[in-house]
Amino acid sequence: MKEKLLIRLFVESDAGAVQDIIHRGLREVNGKDYPAELIEEHCAYFTLEKIKSQAVSAHMYVAVSGDKIVGTGSIAPYWGSEKESILLTIYVFPEMIGEGIGSAIVNTLEQDEYFLRANRIEIPSSITAIEFYRKMGYAFKNGLCIQKRHDS
């Protein structure tokens, strides 16, 4: 990554770029671990309307390098709880994985008010991203999800 990375809150005009990042991440990265039909179901789920809706119910961030959005991630209350939060849709352009963008997004989410007030963080992680979250200090729960506990 040559340009300085800026992480900022999502604005509605970011939806198309965010959708592209999510779809490419699903197809090019997660597609190695999941059947094509499941990947396409997930791509169909992430419509522009769904992304805009998630940005209303969550705090959605985008990572910008130069004038290009290169990553995204969100945090929201977990089922409306003030003591638990959930990290959602953390994706980076496939060709930029390993450049620290995903870590920068998670670090930003960890400074968000939803993270800071929570006693527990849930991440519905893909198989593909498990090792990334482990490196970020998260651990398995029930062999499926990932969680991180901290003092509030």
Regions found by a protein language model. Give the residues of each.
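Basic/polar N-terminal segments that are highly enriched at the extreme N-terminus
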Residues: 1-3
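Residues forming the Rossmann-fold NAD(P)(H) cofactor-binding site
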Residues: 99, 103
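Short alpha-helical functional segments enriched in proximate histidine and acidic residues
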Residues: 25, 112, 132
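Short secondary-structure capping/turn micro-motifs that flank functional sites
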Residues: 71, 129-130, 149-150
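Acetyl-CoA-dependent GNAT
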Residues: 5, 9-13, 20-95, 106-108, ...
